[in-house]
Regions:
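Bacterial Sec-dependent N-terminal signal peptides
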Residues: 1-23
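Repetitive, compositionally biased segments used for assembly/scaffolding
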Residues: 23-215
Length: 215
């Protein structure tokens, strides 16, 4: 995805170490329709994590030599990155269940967990924790506008407009932490209704970016 590299160069250097600490910076990239969060960069201590579609993924570039799992490591790991420099990667396999098979299990000594079928279909297969960083999702009791969408990352709450806010903004991202996301409505005239109007409240520690800016 081309916006990964652009955002990472502008906001911080992607460096993985063996220890996850308190979150110092989080960057949220909205989806094209502004209804969900497409990508998340989390900086914790000297570690940086990239989450896409609610799963931890590996960045596009590394420092140091790369090694990969081969056929002797099993079909669920074969061909996947094993190490980058002094950082080792491990993955869940078929014995861990189909919900999480093939997903990243650990980065160095940082464990990664995912919600499974026992947590409900709204969160099944989505990242639950990265080290001490916790993720939560809305469920069916929160309504169709929010069901399955990101609810929080630690203390950062994510809220969405609902049907009572009008058709133009219904189900779109409303706030992420102290950052507000605003949309044009029918009173603004023309063909702008429902389009992104502004993102207010970005700070050094929390940034929200519209999808188009990352391309």
């Amino acid at each position: 995805m081309p916006n990964r590299l652009l955002i990472s160069f502008i906001l911080f250097t992607l460096t993985l170490t063996a220890k996850a600490q308190v979150i110092s910076k989080t960057v949220f990239l909205l989806s094209e329709d502004n209804r969900t969060v497409q990508s998340i960069f989390i900086r914790a201590g000297e570690s940086t994590f990239l989450i896409e579609n609610y799963a931890l993924v590996i960045p596009d570039y590394f420092e140091g030599s790369l090694t990969y799992y081969d056929r002797f490591d099993g079909a669920d790991k074969e061909g996947k990155l094993k190490s980058a420099g002094n950082i080792n990667y491990d993955y869940y396999d078929r014995y861990d269940g189909d919900d999480i098979k093939g997903k990243i299990k650990s980065v160095g000594d940082i464990s990664v967990s995912y919600y499974d079928r026992f947590d409900g279909e709204e969160s099944m297969g989505k990242v639950k924790s990265i080290g001490g960083i916790n993720f939560g999702y809305y469920d069916r009791f929160d309504g169709d506008e929010k069901k399955g969408k990101l609810k929080y990352i630690d203390q950062i709450q994510v809220n969405y407009f609902d049907r009572f806010d009008g058709d133009e903004s219904a189900s779109k991202v409303k706030t992420i932490g102290q950052v507000s996301v605003n949309y044009y409505d029918r009173f603004d005239g023309g063909n702008r209704a429902g389009k992104l109007k502004s993102i207010l409240g970005n700070s050094k520690t929390l940034v929200v970016i519209e999808s188009k800016r990352g391309l």
